[in-house]
Amino acid sequence: MINCLIVDDDKKLLQYVSSHLERESIQTHTFTSGEASLDFLENKNVDIAIVDIMMSGMDGFELCQTLKDDYHIPVIMLTARDALSDKERAFLSGTDDYVTKPFEVKELLFRIKAVLRRYQINADNELQLGNLILNQSYMEITVGSKTMNLPNKEFQLLFLLASNPKHIFTRDDIIGKIWGFDYEGDDRTVDVHIKRLRQRLSKLKSSVSIQTVRGQGYRVDQNV
């Protein structure tokens, strides 16, 4: 099932859009502020986000940029602002599509599906490598009959590596893609997350392992 984040300070619109998407078997998570939606994403993953521009606190432009930079989520702007300058700013913020209010729900559905096709996200949102299955919707990994839920950052890191098997990622690559380039913490946090993931993969008896490439970084490989 596709998971959709909807952020708008208009509660009636949230209910309206959510009810129509749910009828199309799209699970929705609705929030009236960008801050609340980001709190939610600390523990959950979604496939796509629909974002209004005019909101108190964090506006839609800032939220869009955060969703793209930190969570790599496709975004559709849904807003009453139809000025060319607003559209330009939205696309510069990273939005994948721009829909103006009033709108037809059918058109919004077409656009959601079109954006997801571009991202090649399927309804199950799963990735398999060897005997390891990663489910992005639930942030869980499965080997055989055993399933384990992972913390957000650990799952994002493993998903990044597994999506690019044998590609070597430096610490800076990983920090930029998972924590953001403005991250000011210790770069050894990558090593800590890698160590935890190795322990989890070993516990599940996964055929996938995370290899250290001396002087370069990390990659995933399948054990023979």
Curated annotation (Swiss-Prot):
GO terms for biological process: regulation of DNA-templated transcription. One of its GO terms (cellular component) is cytosol. InterPro entries: CheY-like_superfamily, OmpR/PhoB-type_DNA-bd, Sig_transdc_resp-reg_receiver, WalR-like, WH-like_DNA-bd_sf. Residues 3-116 form the Response regulatory domain. It comes from the Bacteria. Residues 124-222 bind DNA. It is found in: Cytoplasm. Transmembrane segments: none annotated. GO terms for molecular function: phosphorelay response regulator activity; transcription cis-regulatory region binding. Phosphorylated by HssS. The modification 4-aspartylphosphate is found at residue 52. Keywords: Activator, Cytoplasm, DNA-binding, Phosphoprotein, Transcription, Transcription regulation, Two-component regulatory system, Virulence. PROSITE patterns: OMPR_PHOB (PS51755), RESPONSE_REGULATORY (PS50110). Member of the two-component regulatory system HssS/HssR involved in intracellular heme homeostasis and tempering of staphylococcal virulence. Phosphorylated HssR binds to a direct repeat sequence within hrtAB promoter and activates the expression of hrtAB, an efflux pump, in response to extracellular heme, hemin, hemoglobin or blood. This is Heme response regulator HssR.
